[in-house]
Regions:
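Blade/loop signatures of beta-propeller domains
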Residues: 24-46, 209-215
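Short, conserved, GDST-rich strand-edge loop motifs in beta-rich repeat architectures
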Residues: 25-27, 119-138, 184-212, 255-258, ...
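Multi-bladed beta-propeller domains
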Residues: 36-56, 85-101, 138-168, 220-236, ...
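Blade-loop segments of beta-propeller domains
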Residues: 59-62, 79-121
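Blade-level signature of beta-propeller repeat domains, shared across WD40, Kelch, NHL, RCC1
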Residues: 410-454
Length: 454
């Protein structure tokens, strides 16, 4: 793939866009922290938020915790259009952005910083023109908010740079493992310029009319504002993520909203090494890949559909946020348990794949994560139940349930960096059975104390 550089001015301090439509950075909210016993499994759950204000966690492809391990970053209707942090120990909540954001929130692992994209024109809600990448100094926000000495937003928010409008940049963004570059999606017009002549452009795939290309990935140096082009592909890119342990290693997917002809991909930041991460068969429905350790990516090989020509019933299909999505006949014959399914883990170096576990029935595991030390894997299913797997013994338990199939979204479990707990979003406490809260589920103490024979 071709590679080239754009240069933009790095702005260390720039007047923020008008924020009259937004509340103030540093605003504090009282603790809602509650300990609730899971009514089905008995697990003690820590709800860091507990009122129906429309909370949602960061997607499981990305980091959730600040580098000091004390705060989780999330989205909330409390500050519509901006982001919040909640202290895991005290439950105190603070607004951490002002002026809005778009796309993915990127929480640094090596510093107390947050990165995200923002439209240069705040009246424009979609990508397509120039976007800014913003850095937030979280340590300064937390300290000044606590002391009651908050200053203007520009003291805490720095513009790293602005993308050229011709890139058609989108908000699907990921922070490099070295935390000096941020990678983001590029629109079809620019992406087409970097494809080899004669490359076949893919059309939409499946009933959701998604997946058509081309698209690409570019990066911005968050210290200097330099822009570099990484790669173009002939299909729609989604779920851009990075390997936190290997600088320059990128994982992304062919996004169709369901089954893809070839879901998972990887490439290096210099544009080399582009390849399918897990070469899949037409009968495999691969989804929700997430880098979980230095050498591993977890993903779900779905088993949610009825095997054609067999007895048994399947619940009526629903939209993607419902209790039984992906049942449209137009997806083809994939996603059944006629072939192996489950929570799969691919080694980026050896390219070997193993299945860590699978539920005995139902949809099978869906959104997945794992601990960096290789001990645990975790996944949810269509019922919003959470399953924990011991990767050494292959034992699997139902860890938590009762999070309501009617919830506005899926739990999206994410394992903590130290492998002791899992963050989800849950409607368990909501009277309307939809509004979600931020919840922490502990790995059982008896599991944490396990010792394995070498």
């Amino acid at each position: 793939m071709k590679s080239y550089l754009f240069i933009t001015a790095a702005l260390s301090a720039s007047p923020m866009l008008s924020s009259s439509a937004y509340s103030q950075i540093g605003k504090r909210f009282p603790s809602e922290r509650k300990i609730v016993k899971d009514p089905i499994t008995g697990t003690m759950l820590t709800f860091l938020t507990s009122t129906p204000t429309g909370d949602s966690k960061i997607y499981q492809t990305h980091n959730q915790w600040t580098s000091d391990g004390q705060w989780l970053i999330f989205r909330s209707g409390r500050v519509s259009g901006d982001a919040m942090a909640v202290n895991e120990n005290t439950g105190e909540m603070i607004q951490i952005t002002e002026g809005g954001y778009m796309g993915m929130l990127n929480v640094a692992r090596k510093s107390m910083k947050l990165y995200f994209m923002r439209n240069t024109d705040i009246t424009r809600q979609r990508s397509g023109g120039s976007l800014q990448i913003i850095e937030v100094d979280l340590a300064k926000v937390f300290a000044d908010s606590k002391a009651g000495t908050m200053k203007p937003a520009s003291v805490y928010q720095r513009v790293c740079g602005t993308t050229p409008p011709e890139l058609g940049a989108g908000g699907d963004m990921a922070l490099d493992g070295a935390e000096n570059w941020a990678y983001f999606r590029v629109g079809p017009e620019e992406a087409a310029k970097h494809l080899l002549t004669g490359t076949k452009i893919e059309g939409d795939f499946g009933p959701r009319n998604m997946g058509a290309g081309p698209s690409g990935i570019a990066g911005m140096n968050i210290k200097t504002g330099e822009i570099k082009y990484v790669v173009s592909v002939p299909f729609q890119i989604g779920h851009i993520q990075t390997n936190p342990w290997i600088p320059g290693e990128i994982v992304f997917c062919w996004e169709t909203g369901g089954k893809s002809p070839q879901r998972t991909w990887t490439v290096m930041a210099d544009g080399t090494g582009l390849r399918p991460l897990y070469p899949e068969s037409e009968y495999e429905w691969v989804t929700h890949e997430a880098v979980i350790s230095r050498d591993e990516v977890a993903m779900a090989i779905m088993g949610h559909r009825k095997i054609p020509g067999t007895s048994g019933t399947v619940a009526p299909g629903t939209a993607v946020n419902g209790a039984n999505p992906g049942q449209d006949a137009a997806w083809g014959s994939s996603g059944t348990r006629e072939k192996p399914t489950g929570l799969a883990i691919v080694n980026l170096r050896t390219r070997e794949m193993s299945i860590a576990g699978q539920t005995p029935g139902g949809s099978g595991l869906w959104h997945v994560s794992g601990s960096p030390d290789g001990r645990w894997a975790v996944g949810d299913d269509f019922s919003r139940s959470i399953y924990l797997i011991d990767r050494h013994t292959r034992e699997m338990i139902l860890l938590s349930a009762g999070h309501k199939e009617t919830a506005a979204d899926h739990p999206h479990p994410t394992m903590s960096p130290d492998g002791t707990k899992i963050q989800i979003q849950s409607a368990m406490l909501s009277a309307d059975n939809r509004s979600m809260n931020i919840c922490i589920i502990p790995v059982p103490e008896t599991w944490l104390k396990r010792i394995y024979n070498k």
